[in-house]
């Protein structure tokens, strides 16, 4: 009997990507996985519902895939993810072409629901259960480059920032058992993964719920014992939760890259308070100084939200002054998105879109100069580069300072063929604002 083909469109963050990979893993025994949606009998759209632009992209994608039911092979359209969890009832009426809807806590039921739907049980077509207990786990079909993989170490969030809807969608913070994470990481390493990227809504809180204290430093130590893993990268570390044992482990552990993603979001105490952030400008700057003192070569990445309600020009200029003083290595900027059902959406002093855009542009231009100056200092230095792509002329890879998708890349030529997924020693010969150009010094640095 010919297997049905399943295609997946995954939108949103890397945490959503992990969900998509778990769904594909769940379906892989009964269905053939295809990257071509036009030939898929079953199409799954895993949506994002975090900000307005992401919601619109999700709706547009579902509508596009709905057309595949008329023009291509699609017989079953499934919508999952945060947008569905949040707006499932409305979307079912808006887009009747959706056959099955699954919320963020029901992925483990997807194969059963499809079978029941095909057999005529239409009541199974909408599962939007809310749970503060469930964590999606299971065998994954990786959608990243084979040498890197994300590992979600916790689900949900307890921070309740005033602009964010995630706790209402994903539930309270809950850590995965350490042995389950180690088992998954070991399996990934056996399949050729060399870089583990740890993610959660707040990675620094790992273990605080199930072990009674923060245990990220212990998890890092355990993961570093896995044969084949060369890099371990940590994203989404809330500044107020970064603790001394974690800093010490990052400093001492050769496999943990000296890179931290710390979502600051703002530096003005006035705006931080409005955001419901549990930190202050002094706490943030003290933490940065401690990190740089204990780990001199650490790369710090952060994100800022501009145009938050009641943000004054003085508040915004505090960010500019902060960046000029602390010169963070990597910075992302987002315009505030007014999300319904959040406290911030009801605040007075909403900022005009034109002012948000102006502040976003000004902040990015400022950081572009900082980034260029930082990259100039890398010229003539040598780095281990993880090779990820080859376009027929140039190889593309990353050094430890670069996370996939969100940071820059290293481009290089090589007279000899390089293997995708291998590490090579590269000398940097030229810099750009965010990218670097290098030449191969040694073919391998295993």
Curated annotation (Swiss-Prot):
Source organism, top-level taxon: Bacteria
Record field: catalytic activity: L-aspartate(89)-[ribosomal protein uS12]-hydrogen + (sulfur carrier)-SH + AH2 + 2 S-adenosyl-L-methionine = 3-methylsulfanyl-L-aspartate(89)-[ribosomal protein uS12]-hydrogen + (sulfur carrier)-H + 5'-deoxyadenosine + L-methionine + A + S-adenosyl-L-homocysteine + 2 H(+)
Pfam family, one: TRAM_2
Protein name as annotated: Ribosomal protein uS12 methylthiotransferase RimO
Location in the cell: Cytoplasm
GO CC entries: cytosol
Its EC number(s): 2.8.4.4
Main location: cytoplasm
Signal peptide extent: none
Organism: Clostridium botulinum (strain Alaska E43 / Type E3)
Record-annotated Radical SAM core domain positions: 143-373
Family: Belongs to the methylthiotransferase family. RimO subfamily.
Function: Catalyzes the methylthiolation of an aspartic acid residue of ribosomal protein uS12.
TRAM domain sequence ranges: 376-442
GO BP: tRNA modification
Positions contributing to [4Fe-4S] cluster 2 binding: 157, 161, 164
